[in-house]
């Protein structure tokens, strides 16, 4: 039997004669309020086929009552809910539009209804128009209600399953955690952005998380989004990571100083970093316990912790022997050797600075900031912070850690903190006035020592640390990071770097912090936005309109041959307003940004020379790599993790003359560090084996 000519278009079949005939055969309509087994009596198919589940039809409920006059299949027993295995194909469930859930199945043939027989069933011809009419009525009702409802979802959030926001929504931002959340939220909302609570949202403009998550970096859209914290910033922000980076950098610089053409004075690690040993390495552990004596005090710290957690002092042979026995027993335990994730966190022991400079008899340190505003090219800044004081007077023989550690987490444990918390934080201006009054004449210090010598020394140390890890950091356009750096001043006014912290504390629980922290956060976001946009559109970085209090430490635009983005995705670059048809019009374009532009002598010359392309960078790198390979015993460079595929960066290689290997540290007498060139060119050798093991054990942490 041939199929009905209208069967291929069920939604357009309106034959009343067929509908009346089908209604007589199907019988009465089932009551949706009753519960029972719905059995369709179809001639020629048998009871087994009639009992088959109706996949693709969905479930029936009391809230979905058939329209009057709609045709339904006859049932012998009471109707019941039909159990469907899995979700029907191409089924869309409407949500948040009314209390009635409507299911729109695709018009496919389902078992037990219309295709039990492959060809020529008279039942099929009668049932198709009625089922099609039900679908058409539901679609009409759906469109009518949708036309009366607003398009946007509540609170401006993405509805479940949507990948892109509806017109008029977004951009979105996400904040994970409470550290500085109010400041960041107010900043983003002032720009018209909408906050989302969905941590898995991929359509965001800014994501600021306290704890790093691998998924954030896997779904990151380079050049389109901003993401707080570099993926492997632990090279700077963990004790072992910073120690290993400084040691490797020192070895590289010592080899460079052996060359006759490199006589530049560089900063030595022992000049600013206290003597430190790793307890997770047997040789270093034995060396420490061999040199320990009770005349010196040491401090033991976990490698990836902050807020003073897990820190204790070592002052006697008994304490040193107990620590040695504990570490040795753990290392020899076969259970912990087979279960690395249960092994205790790696630790370092650091020589305690026993003669710190005191403010009114209290120990203090200085929190400053290193901002990596852009990673392609690197734009690194220094920012002033504040001084942190202890509540109690300094006593080197005291066992109370609150007198040795200055962070707010430790000071809050004191019962006097609520009354005296304002005295635990000083502004840099307050510190400068105090040192001018108390120590300028007695110590022979220059005027405003805090803002001259001390500030330049902090900038020099930060630059040294950044250059030690620059070739290993994972960089993508849109990554940015704010790192808290803690400095200590001893009574001889020597500056020591204690540690660097990821996700620095941004709380504002006292007046000084209320005056300092918001400015740091706002300028951080401003610089991250501006540098990202300028890099994306191939514009000169300098001058930066959003730069106010931060000082530029490193400008990768003038020192690195850096590629734009991966060649797999082109960028939307700004058109050149002044094309240069004559290739000889400007034969010597200067690639360095000039904050004081001069008139262009050639009207057709391009005032903004193009940046080095991937091909030009590859050519320069090939010649440099060939020169290196000719030297006896030269090591071949390894590709950097996270670097784009198109070309490696020249900053990881040294030229044939060797002049670029010498590190150019900012001088203490220099007036500005802007545009300081990075001439340290060492191959990226990757982290050592013990550092890779520590990477698996280290975990993210909250602000300190």
UniProtKB/Swiss-Prot annotation:
Keywords for the protein's UniProt record, in alphabetical order: ATP-binding, Cell projection, Cilium, Cytoplasm, Cytoskeleton, Ligase, Magnesium, Metal-binding, Microtubule, Nucleotide-binding
Compositionally biased residues, Pro residues: 576-588, 596-612
Biased composition (Low complexity): 616-629, 654-667
Segments of skewed composition (Basic and acidic residues): 114-125
Record keyword Cytoplasm present: yes
Positions of ATP binding: 301, 307-308, 350-353, 363-365, 406-407
SUPFAM superfamilies: Glutathione synthetase ATP-binding domain-like
EC top class named in words: ligase
Gene Ontology CC entries for this record: axoneme; cilium; microtubule; microtubule cytoskeleton
Major subcellular location class: cytoplasm
Bias kind Basic residues: ranges: 93-105
Binding site for a protein: 307
E.C. designation(s): 6.3.2.-
Residues holding Mg(2+) 1: 486, 499
Disordered, as annotated region: 1-32, 46-125, 137-170, 565-704
GO biological process entries: protein polyglycylation
Tissue: Highly expressed in testis. Expressed in brain, heart, kidney, liver, lung, muscle and trachea.
Record text about domains: Gln-307 is the main determinant for regioselectivity, which segregates between initiases and elongases in all tubulin--tyrosine ligase family. A glutamine residue at this position is found in elongases TTLL6, TTLL9, TTLL11, TTLL13, TTLL10 and favors glutamate-chain elongation, whereas an arginine residue is found in initiases TTLL2, TTLL4, TTLL5, TTLL3, TTLL8 and favors initiation.
Function: Polyglycylase which modifies both tubulin and non-tubulin proteins, generating polyglycine side chains of variable lengths on the gamma-carboxyl groups of specific glutamate residues of target proteins. Involved in the elongation step rather than the initiation step of the polyglycylation reaction. Polyglycylates alpha-tubulin and beta-tubulin. Polyglycylates non-tubulin proteins such as nucleosome assembly protein NAP1.
Protein's recorded name: Protein polyglycylase TTLL10
Organism whose genome encodes this protein: Mus musculus (Mouse)
């Amino acid at each position: 039997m041939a199929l009905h000519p209208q069967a291929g278009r069920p939604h357009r079949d309106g034959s009343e004669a067929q509908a009346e005939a089908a209604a007589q055969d199907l019988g009465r309509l089932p009551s949706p309020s009753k519960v029972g087994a719905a059995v369709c009596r179809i001639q020629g198919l048998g009871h087994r086929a009639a009992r088959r589940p109706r996949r693709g039809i969905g479930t029936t409920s009391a809230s979905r009552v058939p329209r009057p006059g709609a045709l339904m299949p006859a049932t012998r027993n009471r109707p019941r809910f039909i159990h469907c295995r899995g979700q029907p194909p191409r089924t869309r469930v409407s949500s948040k539009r009314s209390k009635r859930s409507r299911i729109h199945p695709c018009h496919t043939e389902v078992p037990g209804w219309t295709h039990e027989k492959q060809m020529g069933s008279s039942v099929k011809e009668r049932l198709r128009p009625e089922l099609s009419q039900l679908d058409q009525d539901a679609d009409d009702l759906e469109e009518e209600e949708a036309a009366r409802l607003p398009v946007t979802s509540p609170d401006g959030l993405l509805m479940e399953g949507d990948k892109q926001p509806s017109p008029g929504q977004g951009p979105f931002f996400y904040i994970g955690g409470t550290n500085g959340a109010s400041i960041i939220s107010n900043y983003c909302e002032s720009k018209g952005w909408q906050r989302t609570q969905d941590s898995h949202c991929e359509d965001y403009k800014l994501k600021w998380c306290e704890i790093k998550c691998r998924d954030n970096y896997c779904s990151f859209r380079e050049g389109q989004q901003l993401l707080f914290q570099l993926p492997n910033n632990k090279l700077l922000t963990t004790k072992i990571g910073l120690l290993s980076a400084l040691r490797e950098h020192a070895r590289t610089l010592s080899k460079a100083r052996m060359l006759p053409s490199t006589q530049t004075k560089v900063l030595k690690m022992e000049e600013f970093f206290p003597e430190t040993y790793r307890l997770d390495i047997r040789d270093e552990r034995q060396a420490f316990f061999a040199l320990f004596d009770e005349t010196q005090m040491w401090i033991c710290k976990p490698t990836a912790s902050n807020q003073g957690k897990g820190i204790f002092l070592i002052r006697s042979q008994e304490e040193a022997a107990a620590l040695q026995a504990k570490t040795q027993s753990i290392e020899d335990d076969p259970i912990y050797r087979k279960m690395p994730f249960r092994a205790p966190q790696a630790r370092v022991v650091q020589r305690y600075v026993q003669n710190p400079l005191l403010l009114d008899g209290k120990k203090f340190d200085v929190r400053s900031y290193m901002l990596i505003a852009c990673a392609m090219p690197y734009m690194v800044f220094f920012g002033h912070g504040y001084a942190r004081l202890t509540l109690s007077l300094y006593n080197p023989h005291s066992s109370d850690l609150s007198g040795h550690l200055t962070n707010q987490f430790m000071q809050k444990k004191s019962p006097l903190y609520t009354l005296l918390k304002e005295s635990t934080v000083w502004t840099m201006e307050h510190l400068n006035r105090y040192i001018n009054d108390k120590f300028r004449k007695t110590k022979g210090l220059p005027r405003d020592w805090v803002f001259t010598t001390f500030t330049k020394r902090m900038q020099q140390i930060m630059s040294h640390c950044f250059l030690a890890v620059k070739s290993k950091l994972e960089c993508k356009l849109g990554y940015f990071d704010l790192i808290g750096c803690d400095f200590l001043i001893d009574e001889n006014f020597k500056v020591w770097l204690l540690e660097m912290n990821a996700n620095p504390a941004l709380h504002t629980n006292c007046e000084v912090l209320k005056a300092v922290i918001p400015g740091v956060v706002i300028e951080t976001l401003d610089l991250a936005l501006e540098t990202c946009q300028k890099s994306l559109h191939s514009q000169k970085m300098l001058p930066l309109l959003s730069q106010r209090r931060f000082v530029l430490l490193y400008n990768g635009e003038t020192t690195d041959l850096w590629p734009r983005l991966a060649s797999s995705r082109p960028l939307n670059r700004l058109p050149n307003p002044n094309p240069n048809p004559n290739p000889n019009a400007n034969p010597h374009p200067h690639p360095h940004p000039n904050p004081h532009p001069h008139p262009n002598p050639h009207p057709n010359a391009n005032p903004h020379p193009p940046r080095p392309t991937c091909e030009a960078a590859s050519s320069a790198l090939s010649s440099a790599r060939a020169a290196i390979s000719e030297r006896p015993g030269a090591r071949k460079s390894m590709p950097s993790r996270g670097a784009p595929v198109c070309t490696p960066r020249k900053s990881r290689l040294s030229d044939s003359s060797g002049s670029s290997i010498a590190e150019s540290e900012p001088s203490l007498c220099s007036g500005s560090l802007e545009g300081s060139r990075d001439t340290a060119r060492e191959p990226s050798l990757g982290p050592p084996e013990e550092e890779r093991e520590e990477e698996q054990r280290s975990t993210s942490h909250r602000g300190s």
